């Protein structure tokens, strides 16, 4: 059964405040998203299995622990999810990176899949799907659907900000997926944006409107 984790780490909350601030410029916004992604990745990888190996320090031989050969994959939902990838790869540089392209139909607010590119060994990998926002929940559900349809067995979802009621929608659709969130906000407005949120994450990351 999947779980929902909301991070209350002071560094994450501090940086998230400046990510939200409308006066934060594109360069600083990118850097902050990258930093928060790294901090969240530290927590999300807490359950990685370890195995013992023998090494030799400058002083003596010793038994030490390393990650037990786990294959990981990071899957950003285009385009805003790209801003979180490098922060995660700083901690797990051997992870493969795939991409899922979804856009939200402005009329129906439902996701439309337009691009999927994944590592060839999908069934063997533990995947982390990343997207700064979990608003309606439609994109998260569609991205998880896309991975499962192609054989993925182990999936986690990670976002910066989520709307409370919509987290439940993802849980209901995919009860086996753990969800990791930096902040739960108040609600969605009539246009499907999270309030207070941070605006359009893609536009703020890439300097577009």
From Swiss-Prot:
Pfam family, one: UPRTase
GO BP annotations, alphabetical order: UMP salvage; uracil salvage
Amino acids binding 5-phospho-alpha-D-ribose 1-diphosphate: 79, 104, 131-139, 200
Superkingdom in the source lineage: Bacteria
Cofactor dependency: Mg(2+)
EC number: 2.4.2.9
Keyword Glycosyltransferase: yes
Residues where uracil binds: 194, 199-201
Regulation: Allosterically activated by GTP.
Reactions that this protein is recorded to catalyse: UMP + diphosphate = 5-phospho-alpha-D-ribose 1-diphosphate + uracil
Cofactor-binding details, from the entry: Binds 1 Mg(2+) ion per subunit. The magnesium is bound as Mg-PRPP.
Pathway assignment: Pyrimidine metabolism; UMP biosynthesis via salvage pathway; UMP from uracil: step 1/1
Family: Belongs to the UPRTase family.
Function: Catalyzes the conversion of uracil and 5-phospho-alpha-D-ribose 1-diphosphate (PRPP) to UMP and diphosphate.
HAMAP family cross-referenced by the UniProt entry: Upp_B
Protein name as catalogued: Uracil phosphoribosyltransferase
Origin species: Bacillus caldolyticus
Gene: upp
């Amino acid at each position: 059964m999947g779980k929902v984790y909301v991070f209350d780490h002071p560094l994450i909350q501090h940086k998230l405040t400046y990510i939200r601030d409308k006066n934060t410029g594109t360069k600083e916004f990118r850097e902050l998203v990258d930093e928060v992604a790294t901090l969240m990745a530290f927590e999300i990888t807490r359950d990685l299995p370890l195995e013992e190996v023998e090494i030799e320090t400058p002083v003596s031989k010793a038994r030490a622990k390393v990650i037990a050969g786990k294959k990981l994959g990071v899957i950003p939902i285009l385009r805003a999810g790209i801003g979180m990838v490098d922060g995660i790869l700083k901690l797990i540089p051997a992870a493969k990176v795939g991409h899922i392209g979804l856009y939200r139909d402005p009329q129906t607010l439902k996701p439309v899949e337009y691009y999927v590119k994944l590592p060839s060994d999908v069934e063997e990998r533990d995947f982390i799907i990343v997207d700064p926002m979990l608003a309606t929940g439609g994109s998260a559900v569609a991205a998880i659907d896309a991975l499962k349809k192609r054989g993925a067995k182990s999936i986690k979802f990670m976002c910066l900000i989520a709307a409370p009621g919509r987290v439940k929608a993802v849980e209901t659709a995919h009860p086996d997926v753990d969800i990791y969130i930096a902040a739960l906000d108040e609600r969605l407005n009539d246009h499907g944006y999270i309030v207070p949120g941070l605006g359009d994450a893609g536009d703020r990351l890439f300097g577009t409107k």
